[in-house]
Amino acid sequence: MDNLSTKTDKTKEVDSLSFFVAAVQAARPVHWIKNLALFAALLFTGDLFESLFFAKVFLAFLAFNFATSATYIINDIFDAKSDRFHPIKKERPVASGKLPVRFALIEALGLVGLALLLATGLNPLFHYSVLTYLAIQVLYSLGLKNIPILDILIIAMGFIIRVYAGAFVINAHLSVWFLLCVISVALFLASGKRRAELNIVKDADLITRKSLKRYKKELLNSYVTMFGNASWMSWALFTFFESPKASLPVWLFLAEISRTTTVNKLLMITIPIVIFGIMRYQALIFEGRSETPEKILLTDKALVASIVLWTSVIVWILYGGISVHGI
């Protein structure tokens, strides 16, 4: 009798653990990496190491993490039936039945509540940004994702909202050139996601996303190429016309560059890094490996190296030491 009771207790523990793991998987925490976009304004305004501003953006980051997870769970609830026929998505907690729909809905509503609670205490504009993001994502799940072109625009809009939400928290102004960069990169990632999905599901009968059936590879190829070019070109224009003020340490010989370019345009040295990153990502797209951009950004060594190098150079230029503005 005692053995039976012990086995029952262990079974309950296993079930509870499996349920918890399913709930965490449904929230897709790996996708939170996309919310690092909220730190963009903080980085380029030169206030990255201001503790008050950093704390505000970090709380905003947490709020968007909750909001992002909630929208993914809601989308999984709506797509549960079709996902069961997808070669990859059928393993998701809701589609596989590991997380019952009722509990998934409770989890999603709880995460929405946490996101709005954090947003309310930060900034009215940020609060509206979270609400807008949630509304757009719900509409996307309800059917907008089935409309070609519009689905790509909505995915891209999510990235744009993140960047500007981060700016709202610290009352920062982002230039028009930077907005162009954000839009271009967002469209590049979104079109790349669709192109990779089409590459994965080669059999038309297995395509579960309605909009994907109406896309041609040639069209998505042109989108990827167009937005990839727009991304590095808009970044180049940003570094030339709107580059933040440089701050450099003992390497003052670099100030001599100002004779021909001005020190405030030192961010232009990151252009080759950006071009390499885009070329590498395009290669991954056509290999069908960019259906989930966040995983690629964490696992592809070449891409990770280019992102780390790009960020390091920017931090070095903007935060490296004494100001050389005016040289």
Task: Label the model's feature ranges.
Residues 80, 85-130, 176-188, 222-228, ...:
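Multi-pass membrane catalytic core of lipid/isoprenoid biosynthesis enzymes
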Residues 148-158, 300-303:
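Cytoplasmic-side transmembrane-helix entry/capping segments in multi-pass membrane proteins
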Residues 52-56, 124-130, 148-152, 173-179:
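Short, aromatic-rich membrane-interface segments at the entry and exit
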Residues 2-84, 97-110:
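Topogenic membrane-insertion module of multi-pass membrane proteins
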Residues 2-24, 142, 160-327:
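C-terminal membrane-associated helical module and adjoining short loops/tails
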Residues 39, 43, 113-117, 135-139, ...:
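Alpha-helical transmembrane segments of multipass membrane proteins
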Residues 64-95, 144, 150, 191-199, ...:
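Acidic (Asp/Glu-rich) catalytic motifs at the cytosolic membrane interface
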